Amino acid sequence: SIPPEFTKMAPKNIGFTAGIESNLVPPAWLAKCSEMDLLVVTSQHAATGFKGTIHVQHPETGEKVAVTYGKPIQIINYPIKNLQAEDMSAKINLDTDFNFLSIAQWGPRKNVDNMLKWFVEEFQNDEVGLVLKTSRVKNNLADRQMCSAMIKSLAEKFPNKKCKIHLLHGTMSDEEIHGLYKHPKIRAYVTTTHGEGYGLPLFEAAYSEMPVIATGWSGHLDFLCIEKMTPKGKVKRESLYEKISYSLEPIQKEAEWPGVLDPGTKWAYAKENSFKKAIRKVYQNISLFERRAKTLSD
């Protein structure tokens, strides 16, 4: 749920939310969260957003006043799903031997359009695939046709390309989704997301020992990095994923959602050159990245 839905129901109340995908929490959220005795979020990114100070304009005086959240916050990450991945090699017959995977709703926040365009530009001379599990709004035939048409429109701009985009659409069970992470021809997970409260598909890919390529900002950093002790006794965070560089910029106009994603809030914009270098690097050095993914999973 999101904080506007929080309601005091008992002497002690706990609010649970995945939080935000941008850098700031709407002021109205802070007011509702302050009614709770404890706030539980899924990532350090979400906790930082709630702890940050937000300046808003006083409706009567026009002056800027500070709105802060001062109640306790606890971070609880998602658990690993204890299930048996379904063998998807027969159900999904891929004619490209090396494939990336991305699972995302096709909307502004996931940045799917840029990811597809940059992928085709980088691999137009290579027999490499991208398996895209997506939908625009619903898992129905009209939605599938819309997604297929958008991919076809992109492909027509590169008539001689060797790479392929494989569309997956429709409802899949958890066992089938986890089967994608274990498919012998699907070798790495990739996303150019603008921001995640946590990033569940990335988490599932990571604990399934799949190499991950991702924008280097927001909630998924909780599980894509490990803490190591230096010889001097200091704790150092080590990234075990391939990071896509980014710039923090205001969200797009079409992504604005008053009371959730307010105008002026920011999120990450993956850099094109960094993305292309990352997918090329993983493609050329997959054994190295698979060993790194195994270390992260352990």
Identify the role of each PLM range.
Residues S1-F50, E176:
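Extended catalytic core of nucleotide-activated donor transferases of GT-like folds
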Residues L38-A85:
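Donor nucleotide-sugar binding/catalytic pocket of nucleotide-sugar-dependent glycosyltransferases
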Residues P211-A214, L224-C225, P231-R237, E242-K243:
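Short hydrophobic beta-strand element within catalytic cores of glycosyltransferases
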Residues S274, R280-K281, L288-D298:
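A short, well-ordered alpha-helix in the C-terminal region of glycosyltransferases
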Residues L83-N99, E122-D126, R291:
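Nucleotide-sugar donor-binding and catalytic loop/hinge architecture
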Residues N93-K110, L116-V120, L130-L132:
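Conserved donor-binding/catalytic core segment of Leloir-type glycosyltransferases
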Residues L141-L180, R187-A188:
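Nucleotide-activated donor-binding/catalytic signature segment of Leloir-type glycosyltransferases, i.e.
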